[in-house]
Design a protein with these regions (language model features):
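Metal-dependent amide/peptide-bond hydrolase catalytic core
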Residues: 36-41, 45, 51-56, 60-175
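Acidic/histidine-rich catalytic neighborhood of metal-dependent amide-processing enzymes
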Residues: 1-48
């Protein structure tokens, strides 16, 4: 039995196709991902895992001119968290992090009571993914009156292994 499954939402995390992918993968002995080859035409036998996360920080709104001390800025907190998140990146090991968007606040004269950041993290191994998830789970607020919550998950990496190489060699022979 051969199943071909085309999806169109890979670049946004396979949100609608994820379950179909998992269902077919669970019933399959082998899976080929028909992603474009490398620039020199070489096939890929490994692929980084991709983590898509959202950080939501809540604070306490206050008038910035009348009583700024009664507020707790979600924007100031998220700025501190972004600096800490940068420690996750390690280009030498292939771990990359991008804060794609930050949103927060309502007006310049109001201490922001909410801020959000979208986070993209790429990892070469499942061990790296677990370490990153643990790091994100342990984040704590640094400013009194704020809270930090992170949600999201990883699409696991394809790590080069003996079984992956065997499948690659079989595909080469058949081609």
């Amino acid at each position: 039995r051969i199943v071909m499954l085309w999806t169109t939402d890979e670049e946004i995390g396979s949100e609608t196709s994820r379950q179909a992918i998992l269902d077919h993968a669970d019933r399959s002995e082998a899976v080929f991902v028909m992603e474009p080859s490398l620039p020199n035409g070489a096939l890929k036998t490994s692929r980084k895992g991709c983590g898509q996360f959202e950080m939501i920080v809540t604070g306490v709104a206050a008038h910035a001119g009348i009583e700024p001390g009664s507020g707790a800025s979600a924007i100031h907190e998220i700025a501190k968290q972004v600096v800490e998140l940068q420690s996750l990146g390690d280009n030498d090991r292939g771990v990359s992090l991008n804060i794609g968007t930050i949103q927060g606040g309502s007006r310049s004269n109001v201490v922001a009571d909410e801020a959000r950041a979208s986070i993209d993290i790429r990892v070469p191994t499942q061990t790296d993914a677990l370490q990153v998830q643990d790091f994100l789970r342990r984040l704590e607020s640094k400013i009194a009156g704020t809270t930090v919550k992170v949600s999201g998950s990883f699409r696991p990496p394809l790590e080069r292994s003996a079984s992956v190489i065997r499948l690659y060699e079989m595909a080469q022979r058949v081609a």
